[in-house]
Each structure stands twice: as structure tokens, then as C-alpha cells.
């Protein structure tokens, strides 16, 4: 196996048995690809901005004399880069410029000729751009647009499952859902009449829409019914026989022919009878008159002589009419063939309840439903109906919708028009009637073939189109009214509606969310999330169990584990590891092709619709070396069911065992041993882990850690191979290999690292280099670790030595006992960065001022401020300290003559202003790490702002100068090589400045040209460098674009270091969460016979009922991994020979059935072995992939190799008494996380604060500085103890006795510790409530 430079530093021992067939795809591709489609010009006009423009343009004027045509578009350059936008609170976006063509026609009587053409580029607002990591910067904050899983456009057949009507009758319905436009529903009522609804309005008989489509009754009956033809011969009625139509009927007469009786009267006609009639080729039978009476005639019968209608179509035959027909010479009568079994008379019955009788009346009926109260005119009714389903502007099925529509109706063609036509509507009605007749089945709405994913690009395109449509109306009016000769395209387009639509979507849509940035995993999961909520989706309240449930088609597409607990369960899902969307937006998952039992390397992506036709084997099916299945019978999935199939029947096989789970769930080792509910919690809690100060890779991982860390974008990854030329805390410089260099470039890659930046969740983002000077690196290697990563692997928590045992009740109910050593070693210490801002506004009374001259504030309080009134960087501040001094003008107060005199004498200003400084919130203490000042254009900058500007300029100049020097030295190395090849002495040259080297006269023409070329390159580089500095300088010194009325904003960043403490929440990766109950001295913790104490004591009772056994297996394997690490550490300490070290590590890697990983350490140099050993001395990292992990015997092998008992249990001693505990205890290493539920953020104590307006009781919650609720049960407790005075205090002065509490406050101030309880306000509220019911209630005083 070939290892990259980073992987060689620390190899993970892999217990995976199945070979890796397919690499994990780039995890953010769903976001990036979707947005790329939106933004890149698509010549086919199917996607993105191009599609939106083409759907709206050309815009014609109402009079048709002119039109505005779309030519092309381009996106301009962004003003600020991503980091600058975040600092300034700006949106990272690019201006959209569209080339439009205005064509003016000269109208003749016969034709229009082009009179004038004007082309112009028009600005159409800003389009937010996606960063490289799949996020958007909107107003300075990082946001993610979550993909939406919505009902695919198309036609769906469904039923109410008998829930609507009290009789329990199943009512069927069909719904045509377009991508945009009106919905069309068909539904049966309990009387079996078929109705239609447009846009869920009032229902109409289905015949109305058929009449509106220009069908008359006769044509409607012809379309939907088969005919029975009765002939009248010699006063006898003869039926032209189609034998199948008799099935299931009871013969009401003897069915006979030529004297032979085939079915006796009263007998049920069976398939045997029908076959007999067919065999004897009986084409007609004589029937009694009763048989024809009551049947429904399929067409109008009109007397040819008189023109009188004898019987209209869809009317029952009676004896009287039969006679009339005979008289008028009709000897052949067509009736509808209907029966109760499979040919119901639904359309015929519906026609009877329909009051309309022609197209016009049907159109008027539709108009009345859609536009109630408006008078219908012929033109208006026709326009409305035409626009509803047949106009491309108002109705769009989309390519997906048309494909689904045609597939549902079993048509061969998948393409077609994007609007509906007559055939579509008729075919849908036919199919729903077939379903009602028992042919065909209803669709499963929760099948992933009926739900598609709408990603960022598509949603942004829809919003953009909405904006364009708003502009279209205005343009049409301008084209009709304006003076066309002077009009230019620029004059017609107003970019505001477009910008507003796009801004609204990115800023306030339910699916554009504030990014969850706790750690790299939470970022990735947020970007891969799929929500059923949002515009055009479901709502929480109305979503039933079926939608939320796991469906068989989720396999390999949507994770069955990772979903939130609570009201959103099942509505918000996560994409599976290998899943992707196809061109239609349906989720698909990869499979290996299988032919005659041979598994090939060929990979096909199948959507849920295609998958149903195949038999698919699981990933853990046994295969021999040649690729054949070893077992005759293989467990497979087919049409959502699992069963055994012959190996030769199998069509496909899963790609990987972790195919079904999401990224979050695939990081849980031994997931297969955990209960699903706990696995769900585990997957969700990993996202809440706070990045620790010192990262620590998980000893027991799943092999997904590297993929997550690299794809999340928090690490710095090498773009090209090369050698590390320079490293410091903030930058890495790589000299690129010549093979990968572009022509005319210096061959240097510079990576600037992010230092101590605030994340959305106030955690700290910081990158640290993990390469050294002179090291050779390859493309894709990790150069710097970000938050929660360790040597390019995801590291969310710490490996802790845990023991499962009770300890004096301190681990009752999931509490956790932690050793003090964990605090001392800063294992779970985290840094949180808070941004506090102070805004200086222009008020009616004058401008607020930021200064250190604050009224009534002592010297001590101002000691940390500079002369501009802003805190120093590096100052340590606590709650209540002033960060930014600010004074606000106060309204003029009436002054006494004495005060006026004093003011006139001393010119005192202090009383004009009040202190409104920015202070540190209570309970927060930390270090100021950065200050940013934003000043409005035209407002004079203070001294501190200028200092900050100078510092920034210096830093940028220094950075760019260093960058330039590196490029320059690279160029001169080139020149030196050229000189050396010409045997020119370079010692003298070294004394000359670089620029003079270019003027050295060289005889060889080709070499001279090369030097000239390099000189030109040097000149260009210098110019570019100066240009860069100038651009940066302008950006820094220009005024900021602030909100109206804001003069200045000062942002102060505080870094708070938080150690772990009682009350903090911790968890493992298996849903085993708990709160720290006590931090115990190291000497009191249980220890083993070597004197090593445990770090954490967990309650063993937390395991059996919760069924997350994965944590126990992780503990055992962790113990073995640490044991092997200890042995390597011992060998390093005793300076064993490197050959012995190599052998030992090789043995460790060879343990177990390593079918996937074969490590050969002979290819490693001695230095590499030493470096590897140093990284393994704290434990050998292990990978146990999901559903393909380490087996029990392998864990035992590992324990044995580490020299530990194979039971995984050891004898422990009590730290306090030194006595043995009575039985061996499970001790091992578990990966523990500190979650972002810190006691510091939750705990507060109320002194005196705000009260509720109505009840006058204290508010609740930390945000309102609220009190503790003393509820009903607490009152019972005090009553039970007979603590009457305490109870009285709780119900009055401590709660809502307004007078009592004021008096008590006064008494305490006076030193009089007495209280007089009065009437609680809530009692008065109760009185008023009773009075509002009309009952007078008064209190009598004794």
C-alpha cells in the first residue's frame, strides 16, 4: 500500500476485511456542483442563470413594435475577498452584467421590418458567490443553503386508505404536480362520481374539464367505455358476444346457441364457461328484452324523418324507447359495457350530475371557481383556461415532471412538452378509473423515486426567475409607452427587484441557515443535510409518521440513523457517504455490476426508480479471489425486501459496508453493536463537540477521519508537490516541483494560515503547521492542522482512561466522575472567542462620541483604555469592565439659576452626556485579542483607527514583500544556473544587486533571449506586486459602508479559556452522555497495580438498558492499542535497535485478518520508522470500519499481544484506602467529547431584574436575567414540611407582591430585616378574569 507523506507519520491499523472498491467521493460536491451549474453559462439553456434568462426573454411590448432580447451574461470581479467580507460584515458577491439587445420594428400592413437595433450591457444586481467550502458569506456571517427533498413534479395516484368516509370506503385520487403552475387533482367521492379540483379549490365534476377541452358527451363516452352492440332480428334481440365481458355475472337466462345450453339460468359464469364459448366460436347470442332494458345508450339516436331526438347519449333504455327505436328503423343499438367488477360506470354517472352541456358553460363554471365574484366574458374564460395548463409562461412540468409523467402512464417516450395536452389529461383519468376498477396500484409517495432533491443552484435560479418576472412587467410597459428612439436597454431594467429577490432568499429563506461551525464534522454534515421543510415542502405540524419513517429506498441514499431528535425527526436527513444526485435531481447510489455470479470492478449509479428492477447483494457477501460469490445462496435486496437468491440471479452488489450511513454515523466505531436510538444520539452529539486546545486523534477510529478533515476545508492541503521552503505559525511556503510548474511562473505556493478567528458558534478557528523545513510533500498532503484535527485526521475529543464502576454515588444517573489530572493537563480546555460591538450613532440631540472622557467613572475603570477610549489588545478583562468608552448626549434638563451660574463659570459639560459604554457582560472574563474599527465615509478617524490601519498596512506590506523576495530568489536561482552553464564566474555577481544581473552581456543568443525573458518576468512581477499593495492600501484606508445613522463601529474580540468543570456535558460516540458531577483529586481515583490512576469513572448501569455495547468494545480495543503504544514507548526509552523496533511494529500491524491493509515497513527508511514510532508511543491508532470492524477474537489477540488480560478487566485499588475493589473492573481507553453545553453559558443567579407586565412575576431564563420557577410540586414540598413562612415569602415578596417587595428592599437598605406580605398581583389577575366572565367577586375586610 502506498502511503502519502502525512500518512507515513502515523499509520492507522485497519481491521477492514472488504477491499476498497470506490474511494469516498468529495463530500461537499452536492453543494459545489449545484452552484457551479447555476453560475456557469450553460449553452443548452437547461440550467442556471442562462435558463432563467431564456425563459423570460425576449420581452415584447404590448403593441409588438419592439422587443428586448437577451444575448449573454458575465459575472464581474468581487470587491472584497472572503476574509475581508467577514471582517466588514459585507456580502461576498459579484456584480451580474447582462448584454441585452433592443430591437425596434417598423410595422407595414403585411410584415414587420427591423428599424433599429441597440445593444448594451446592463447591471442586474449582485449574485452571492459560494466559497471554496460550499458556504456563502451574507452580511459577514457564513451561511449554508440546505438542499430540499420535495415531491417530484409529475402525476401521482393515491388513496385515502379509507380514512375519509365513515363507511371505510377507499377513495382514490390522482394529482398532477407541475414544477410551477396550477395543481390538477382528480378524486372519487363516496358515490363513485369522479371530480376535478384546480389548485385545491372547490371540486367540479370531471366532465366539466373534458367539455372545456372541447369534447361532447358522445365523444367522452367513446373515450372511456367499451360498447355492447345489440341487434334486433325478427323481433328478437341478439347480442354481439365478447365472452370475457360475461365473467363474474350470474346468468339471468339460459345461454344457448343452436339448442345447446352453455350456461344454465342462475349459474355464475366462470372462466371455464368463457373458454367453452370461445372454443365453439360463438359470436352472438339471443337475449331476452329484460337484458337490454336499463342499459345506457352510448350515442344520440335521432329520427331521420322528423329530426326528433328519440334518446340522447348516456340515457337508460326503457321498453317505450325501444319500441320507438324499432319504429324509426334503428335495428342496431350501442350501449355502454359496465359491470360491478372491473368496468364501473363512473364517468357516465358523473356526466349525469354535470349541469354544463357545452364548452362555454364548462369554461364559465371553471372561471367562477377560480375567480369568484368576477363577471365571466367569453374571452376571459378562454384565456384563463388556456393559461392554467397550456401556456409555457404560466405552467411548467419541467423535464423531470415530463419524464415522471410519461413513466407513470407507461409511455415509452420520456421527453415531451413541458405543458399539458388533451391526451395527458385523458390518460390520467383513464388510469385513475383503472385503479378504481382494480387494475394497477397507487403510488408510494415516500418512495425516493417520487421525491427529488432541490439544491442551492436550483433554488437560487427559481428566486432569480421570480425577480426577472417582476422586472418583465415594468419592461413591457416601458416598451409600449416610452419614446423608443431614445430608449436604451439600461433605461428599462431596474436591478432592485432582482437583487431583492436573491437577497431575500439568501438572507431569510428557511433553507438558508446560519452555518453550524462547532467543528469540521458539523460543517460537513450541515452542507450534506437534506430537509423536507421549507418553501414548497412540508410543515412540521402536518407531517405524519409515514413521511418521517425510514423507507427501503433510503438504502445508500439517505442515512437511516442521523436525524434530529424532537419535532423535526425524519424530516431533516443526512446524505449517505456515497450518494449523489443525478441530472433529474433524484438520489442515486453506486453498485458493482455482477454477471453470472462474478463481481466486476464496473460501477453503476442507480436511482431508486431503477433499483427496483434489480437483485442486489450486500457488501459483506463472501467473494473468492477471482471475484465469484462463494455461497450458492446470497442475501439480497429486491423491491424493498430482503431474501435469499441464487448467486447467478444477482445483478449488482453494494460498493461498501458504510454505504448506507452518513458521514457522521460512519465515524462511530462498532456502530453495528449499538442500538439505533443511541447511535442516532451519538451521531448528533459528535457535531456538538467543542475543539479542544490540544487535539488528540481517536485511538479507535473508522478510517473516515482523514476524509472528513481534508474535505471540510479546515486544514491546509498542498495544491502541488514540492519542498517546504519556509514555515512559521502564520505561513507555509512550498517550492513547487518543476514537473508541476506552469510556464512563466516562479514556482512558489504560499499558504497563509488562519489564526485565532471566531467561528459562528464562538469556538476558535486556528491552524497550526504540521510540516517541517525541507520536507518533501506530495499534492493533497495536509500541511497544517485546523480546529479538531490532528495530523490531518479528525480529532473531536480526547482518549481517556475510563473505568466502568460505581464510585460513591458520584456517577448516579449518568453522572461522570473526572480526575483532577484531566484539568491539570488541559485535556478538555477550550478557547471561546466572543465578539462584542459598540455602535456610535447620530442621535437627534447630536452624535454619540467614543472617548475615554466618561462622566462619573473612576481612574481605575479607565486603566485598560487608550486615549481614544478603546481597550488595549492583550488586556485581561472581567465582568463589568469598560471595553469601549462612549457617551451619549442627554436631553436638556431644566437647570436652577445656581447651576446655570456654576456652568457659566466652569464650562462644565459632564451633565450634558450620559455614559453608554460597552462593558464586558457579567460572568465573562477573558483576554482582548483583537479590535476592529469601522468608520463611516467622511467621519474623521481617531488615533486608534489610524494605528490599526498602519499595523494592517505594515503586515500586508511585509507579507507581500516576503512573497516577492521568495519569487525573486527563485528567479535568480534560475539565472545563476544559466550563468553556471556558461562557465561565468558568479562570485563577483553575488556582490552586485539583483537588477544589475540582467545587464550582463552574453554572447550566446539563445541564452541572452532566456535572460531577457526572465528580466521581463521580473519587471512584470514587480509591477504586479506594487499594484497589489496599492489595491490593499485603498481597501484598508477607504471609509466603510455602514447602516444609516451609524458613524462608527468598534468590535472587540475576547478570548475566553474554559477548563472542564462540574456541570459541563460530556459524551462518548455511542450516545453515552452525562454531566460531570465532581472533579476528584488524582490521589483519590481508583488505580491499577502499576499505580496508574483512571481519568474517568462511568456508571456500568448506563450500558445494559441502553444496548450500546459499542462503547465496551471500544474500551477493550482502546486498552490494547494503548498497551502496544506503551511497549513501543519502552523500546524508544531503552533505545532498542531500529531493526527490533521495525519488527515489533510490523508484528502489531500484522495482527488479525488484515485483508484490506498490508503494511510493509521494509520500504520505510530508519528515520521514517523512528518518526512513526514516536507518533505511535501514545497508542497505535486503529480503524474499525462500520459493519466491517474488528471481531471479538481479534480484540483478544490485540490484548494478548499488548500483554493484557483478554477479559479486558483488571484489578483496581481504591485511591482513598488503598484496598482492592472486590472484583475486576473493565478499564480501557474511550474517546470522550466535551459538548457545547457548558455550565458557564447556562448558569446565572438573579438579584433584582425585570418582571412580567401582567402577572408582575419575575421573568424566566438567562436571557431575561430571570428567576427560578417555584412550581406546583415545589409548593407541595414546602406544604409537606410545614414551612409556612418560607412558603408565604415565596408566594408574595419573592414573587408578585409589588408593594411588599418594594417595602422589603427599603427595609433591607435601612437595616430592618422584616417583611410585610401583601396581596399577590396574580390574585388580582384571577379576580379580573372571573369578573370578565360576568361574575362579580369582591374581597371583604374583616
UniProtKB/Swiss-Prot annotation:
It holds the Pfam family RNA_pol_Rpb2_2. One of its GO terms (biological process) is DNA-templated transcription. The keyword Metal-binding does not apply. Its EC number is 2.7.7.6. SUPFAM superfamilies: beta and beta-prime subunits of DNA dependent RNA-polymerase. Keywords: DNA-directed RNA polymerase, Nucleotidyltransferase, Transcription, Transferase. GO terms for cellular component: DNA-directed RNA polymerase complex. One of its GO terms (molecular function) is DNA binding. It catalyses: RNA(n) + a ribonucleoside 5'-triphosphate = RNA(n+1) + diphosphate. The keyword Nucleotidyltransferase applies. Transmembrane segments: none annotated. InterPro entries: DNA-dir_RNA_pol_bsu_ext_1_sf (IPR042107), DNA-dir_RNA_pol_bsu_external_1 (IPR019462), DNA-dir_RNA_pol_su2 (IPR015712), DNA-dir_RNAP_su2_dom (IPR007120), DNA-dir_RNAP_su2_hyb_sf (IPR037033), RNA_pol_bsu_bac (IPR010243), RNA_pol_bsu_CS (IPR007121), RNA_pol_bsu_protrusion (IPR007644). Gene3D superfamilies: 2.40.50.100, 2.40.50.150, 3.90.1100.10, DNA-directed RNA polymerase, beta subunit, external 1 domain (2.30.150.10), DNA-directed RNA polymerase, subunit 2, domain 6 (2.40.270.10), RNA polymerase alpha subunit dimerisation domain (3.90.1800.10), RNA polymerase Rpb2, domain 2 (3.90.1110.10). Disulfide bonds: none annotated. The RNAP catalytic core consists of 2 alpha, 1 beta, 1 beta' and 1 omega subunit. When a sigma factor is associated with the core the holoenzyme is formed, which can initiate transcription. PANTHER family: DNA-DIRECTED RNA POLYMERASE I SUBUNIT 2. DNA-dependent RNA polymerase catalyzes the transcription of DNA into RNA using the four ribonucleoside triphosphates as substrates. Belongs to the RNA polymerase beta chain family. HAMAP family: RNApol_bact_RpoB. This is DNA-directed RNA polymerase subunit beta. It comes from Buchnera aphidicola subsp. Acyrthosiphon pisum (strain Tuc7).
